[in-house]
Amino acid sequence: MLAKQTERLSFSSVKNKPAYPDFLDLQIKSFQDFFQLETKSEERGNEGLYNTFLENFPITDTRNQFVLEFLDYFVDPPRYSIQECIERGLTYSVPLKARLKLYCTDPEHEDFETIVQDVYLGTIPYMTPSGTFCINGAERVVVSQLHRSPGVFFGQSFHANGTKLYSARVIPFKGSWIEFATDINSVMYAYIDRKKKLPVTTLFRAIGFERDKDILEIFDLAEEVKVSKTGLKKYLGRKLAARVLNTWYEDFVDEDTGEVVSIERNEIVLDRDTELEKDHIEEILETGSKTILLHKEDNQTGDYAIIHNTLQKDPTNSEKEAVEHIYRQLRNAEPPDEETARGIIDKLFFSDQRYSLGEVGRYRMNKKLGLDVEMDKQVLTKLDIITIVKYLIELINSKAEIDDIDHLSNRRVRTVGEQLSQQFGVGLARMARTIRERMNVRDNEVFTPIDLINAKTLSSVINSFFGTNQLSQFMDQTNPLAEITHKRRLSALGPGGLSRERAGFEVRDVHYTHYGRLCPIETPEGPNIGLISSLSVYAKVNGMGFIETPYRSVTDGKINTSEEPIYLSAEEEEGKKIAQANIPLKDDGTIDTDRVIARMEGDFPVVDPKEIHYTDVAPNQISSISASLIPFLEHDDANRALMGSNMMRQAVPLLRTDSPIVGTGLERQVATDSRVLINAEGEGEVEYVDANKIVIKYDRTEEERMVSFDDDSKSYNLIKFRKTNQGSCINLKPIISVGDRVTKGQVLCQGYATEAGELALGRNMKVAFMPWKGYNFEDAIVISEKVVRDDIFTSIHIDEYSLEVRDTKLGNEELTNDIPNVSEEATKDLDEHGMIRVGAEVKPGDILIGKITPKGESDPTPEEKLLRAIFGDKAGDVKDASLKASPSLSGVVINKKLFARAIKDKRKRAQDKEDVAALEKKYDAKFANLKADLVEKLFTIIGGKTAQGVQNDLGEEVMPKGKKYTLKMLNAVDDYTHLTTGTWTTDDHLNELVADLLHNYKIKENDLQGNLRREKFTVSVGDELPSGILKLAKVYIAKKRKLKVGDKMAGRHGNKGIVARIVRQEDMPFLEDGTPVDIVLNPLGVPSRMNIGQIYETVLGWAGQKNGKKYATPIFDGATIEEINDLTDKAGIPRYGHTYLYDGGTGMRFDQRATVGVIYMLKLGHMIDDKMHARSIGPYSLITQQPLGGKAQFGGQRFGEMEVWALEAYGASATLREILTVKSDDVIGRAKTYEAIVKGEPMPEPGLPESFNVLMHELKGLGLDIKLEE
């Protein structure tokens, strides 16, 4: 028998929808590309961690004598499993090692041998299979960042007087920014790093266009004329384009060195734009100039007036002057010599050490400027600078367009891998610095790579990134949808991004390039709106970091359905006409209408089908996962849909899950891709099932058995009552029985907001839209008592309480149930370690973990010490430091854990040695058996065949070519993990089998090594705990929360409300057949909010309940009103759900029909139990002595200024005085009042409020002496 799966009837009309990409690809693929562990080192691309190493190595010392070269890196298996890390508060990480080679290039040190070593570089947090990182026991997600792409951007702004100013900004991947901008006088300046400005022509001179002539030639602006008396006469009246200079050299003696130095001097004879007159000819001849430059006579030069204006402002005349001018601008000092001055520009923009556009920047630059510079040339070139200035001039003359900064071709995604690369870059650069220093210090001593490297450098950078970076976030784990959405989130905030305060409306707005890439609906409400968005369902991030979305290509009005969809980035999509996914088609895929509404950039032209380039692949391609889960989204207002998508992420997993009757067809994919459930790995039969584990016997061929080291049966452990980050509960239960046949990918369990392999965030409820005695006024909700009684909205929440035992200066703390001055009743549930027993019911104030800590007191006298020793009075020197239940905590203890560090004494050390030896012996036997197994299997496959020369990693031949394989020969090989899998025999099929066998052997051997390492560590070190902590005790308390008045509920359409009344079932309105409704919603919540989708859902849900069917109505492609009417008619229920209801109290029929049906409701994480709070006495603020505020601080209710006015208005002076003094900050008064209440005496007079004293001290701080007089 096959296990059950929910079948959904789909209303979709669009055929050929492609499969969704894996929803976690954004995280997992990015991380895999970063580490490239599956790839052999010689095949690794120049990306990720490998590239970061190559950028920082080789490292040489200052004299270039020693070189440290990087060869390869690898990681060892993690020490703990993910679950162990979560329980012990550890980081799930892998040890990173690099193979480094140290050699000497100096012939004097010929005795120095080349050393190759594997060096430990620290432990690096490793991604779990579900795309998260476990850091210090908490699951975290690194959110991808959406930032400005490197490249060149052209923009415009307006001066106060209305003049348009244009600018071009070059944003590099690393290095200084350079900006070219115009000012109101039509002069073009270059700004370096946004602060220092210089005329563009100065920059031109500095990069090699030394003379005016060279600069004017770039733009073809001048005519060169030979100087001769007669020749110049015909040019009289024309204007000079460049200065006429008189140049000479002066010699002077440098006083410091005594050298003779010659200096070039320039004198301006005629300035630019001087009209050539007769008198000038003589002056020009005297200078000895061979040629002069004149303005061209054609009218084309008007466009380039800005260059002439800039030359006028340019104070320099030669390359030397230009570089010195730039040096002075940037350094605010005179250049020491010409070379230093020249070096500054080279270093800033032309050195690949300091400056890089990155691959993306070069690509964008070439695209924008129409250049063809090689992709690996990642510094600025002269051509880049010239082309940018030319483009800017075109912009000024309205011959080019400015860039749209919010266009997705100008924004790119920095995924986890890239962010980690950057952090590794920082860490390795620091490490390189220390290595260089150590190399320089160790001159002639013999040293090895290990001596040079400090492993802490790298891991401290990486750990601070995961711990404190704004983009490394505590995972939202309320339900599977919240997890998956958090991993697919894109944030414009964070280092190198925007800040909330500075972001304007344009950045936050929906842009036409978001179509199919970023969801226009799902974004937070509040200050982050539009800055944090979600990736659309089909979107992918390409190698450059740009978001792509799939389309089907169209040729001559016919869609190519047979081909795979084509992924296009925003830039590639420009200028293309794209049709909707649901256009009518003929059977052969030809568009079946005369005119088509298409999308082209931000426009919607109506065009001929032959003009269409592409069509969308699916109607829901525009939205993210959350929005695609809202049925009938097309009938909802976008603002409400936004609330709906956000609230689905806050839905608490319920005790009894139930998938929606009206879904959208995406529910299964979300549940699968969230990696919460267990799926069958192939065809097979269920052998054993209980609440904790499932065992499946898989069908395998003889060959599969041959290359595997595992049994046919595989057992899966189910997660039971695991606490999530948000305190909700993951508890999986099997949905298959012994003897069932399972297929590959089939879901074996349910729970944690899933049912039968589908996402199930809430429950289907019988609903009536009608007012009920005013109790559902303003979005309040009326609920039937049956909902509470049947545990329909009951959820389990787990709290973790922990207590650390530290060693203090006065002695060690201790866990115990023997606590001073505490009754036996209070400690009855504690074990000998002071931990509460599993199953105990906890009430506020109960002791959860008993702990005593030494009390700091004056040293006892010798007599006291003696008496204490005799009578054992220990209570005097310890105080109670137990963990007690907080005021709102009640529940049942479901688990407890105690972790302890191993205590080392001589006997224990000896015992440890024995235990480790026994362990090693046990594992040696396991390794031997595994190898014997391998040899036997290998012999079965290739025994008697001729060897083709098998080599190991180092290229040494292990099995000689031409010999036949024998058992002896196979047994003689020491290490099978380092053999090349390749040509063992001449038969390719056998070679593949051997490769698979060796691969599986490596995995198995690795697992055993990991287990051995872990067990050894546990024996010798005990539990790994942070320093200074001897023991860590944890208690888990579960609370079963039923639905209560004050809990927040919501539908999927942004229809949220608070439970206002729980009504007896017999008092609820009922249908004609006597069925009472479960929930009554206010009809006034629908029309003004314009989320009519909930009404469609209600009606279709009722039809589904009656017909016993579940439906999928994909967004923008869902059920029409006609289809719903057909189903309601078939089910025998009234159209539109319009039904007469009867009053539960009187049995009378209500006058008007109401809409009745089945709606899917969620219980949200905002529960009254977490919010309700009361205080009589509690903690006070240190300075003002007023009560603290908030539930977390066990605070009081603030009685503010306006409340004081209210009491003043009533003339309630005594109440007011009491509130402002003894109930607040009159310290002496409140103590006396408490005493008076206890003793039953009359209330004393209030004293002076502490806040008055604070004011007095403030005034004294200002130097005013204030005396109080009676």
UniProtKB/Swiss-Prot annotation:
One Pfam family here: RNA_pol_Rpb2_45
Catalytic reaction(s) noted: RNA(n) + a ribonucleoside 5'-triphosphate = RNA(n+1) + diphosphate
GO process terms (BP): DNA-templated transcription
EC number: 2.7.7.6
Alphabetized UniProt keyword annotations: DNA-directed RNA polymerase, Nucleotidyltransferase, Transcription, Transferase
Gene3D superfamilies cross-referenced by the UniProt entry: 2.40.50.100, 2.40.50.150, 3.90.1100.10, DNA-directed RNA polymerase, beta subunit, external 1 domain (2.30.150.10), DNA-directed RNA polymerase, subunit 2, domain 6 (2.40.270.10), RNA polymerase alpha subunit dimerisation domain (3.90.1800.10), RNA polymerase Rpb2, domain 2 (3.90.1110.10)
Assembly and interaction partners: The RNAP catalytic core consists of 2 alpha, 1 beta, 1 beta' and 1 omega subunit. When a sigma factor is associated with the core the holoenzyme is formed, which can initiate transcription.
Entry's family note: Belongs to the RNA polymerase beta chain family.
Alphabetical list of NCBIfam families matching this protein: PRK00405.1, rpoB
Its biological purpose: DNA-dependent RNA polymerase catalyzes the transcription of DNA into RNA using the four ribonucleoside triphosphates as substrates.
Name used for this protein in its record: DNA-directed RNA polymerase subunit beta
Organism the protein comes from: Christiangramia forsetii (strain DSM 17595 / CGMCC 1.15422 / KT0803)
Gene name, Swiss-Prot/TrEMBL: rpoB
